[in-house]
């Protein structure tokens, strides 16, 4: 409580992506379009999964949860970034900064755990297909999703606690477009080396260990594909390569940023764009929208809408 009582900073000022007004307007238009595509693409997947019985499978249950997480994850940072691109002075209150930081880590950690679950789902489906219905039943799926949200909440509470326990009484300039633990604790009026080590132990270890676990699972899948038919091999390779692309795009920036205590590079802002803006956009296209089952479901939904419209005209 003493640390909190010593807090003097009431707001933080973002430097944003650039100080060039022309570039800011271009970025605003580009990121606005990306955000709209992110929302629409992920919402379409959720709707298709809910209203199409053929998609009521564990994999699409997890992917619809991924779409929900991507909507939330991008909504934590992108709207504030767009506001900053329009305004000359880019500020955020201390409380809102901590709130943004909490939800950023909640949704990011939930996505990390969900990507592990998706990898495990593919491992069971491809390597032990006969046991798949028993291993990945709906009860297990719901328990896994509950566990990932619980794990994400615990992680985020830990990161938030490490941040707010420090006194902030001096500089308030954040060289980014959003609040994150490594960026905020550098502004604390005390030595943060130990806190930085704890952050690496928390975020860095989670990112790196989970990435290695996912890579290992896909390597096991690739080895087991030798036992499958050529058609089955091709389908599994297509699915796994798409999944691994998302894993690399998301885990790469996280590992780059969260495994370095007390160090930062000018490229960090660009790297952050990948996992806060780009990955939530690409996930629906890489995972599902190019999938024939999802395309068929989308077509059925359009036909239902056409029938609904015609019946009232």
UniProtKB/Swiss-Prot annotation:
It comes from Homo sapiens. It is found in: Cell membrane. Pfam families: 7tm_4. Its main location: membrane. GO terms for molecular function: G protein-coupled receptor activity; metal ion binding; odorant binding; olfactory receptor activity. Residues 50-57, 121-139, 220-235, 290-313 are cytoplasmic. Cu cation binds at residues 105, 109, 260. One of its GO terms (cellular component) is membrane. Olfactory receptor that is activated by the binding of organosulfur odorants with thioether groups such as (methylthio)methanethiol (MTMT) and bis(methylthiomethyl) disulfide. Also binds odorants cis-cyclooctene and tert-butyl mercaptan. The activity of this receptor is mediated by G proteins which activate adenylyl cyclase. It comes from the Eukaryota. This is Olfactory receptor 4E2. The gene is OR4E2. It is a multi-pass membrane protein. The chain crosses the membrane at residues 26-49, 58-79, 101-120, 140-158, 196-219, 236-258, 270-289. The keyword Transit peptide does not apply. Belongs to the G-protein coupled receptor 1 family. PROSITE patterns: G_PROTEIN_RECEP_F1_1, G_PROTEIN_RECEP_F1_2. Glycans are attached at residue 5. Copper binding enhances receptor activity in response to odorant binding. Residues 1-25, 80-100, 159-195, 259-269 are extracellular. The keyword Membrane applies. One of its GO terms (biological process) is detection of chemical stimulus involved in sensory perception of smell. InterPro entries: GPCR_Rhodpsn (IPR000276), GPCR_Rhodpsn_7TM (IPR017452), Olfact_rcpt (IPR000725), Olfactory_Receptors (IPR050427). Disulfide bonds join 97-179. Keywords: Cell membrane, Copper, Disulfide bond, G-protein coupled receptor, Glycoprotein, Membrane, Metal-binding, Olfaction, Receptor, Sensory transduction, Transducer, Transmembrane, Transmembrane helix.
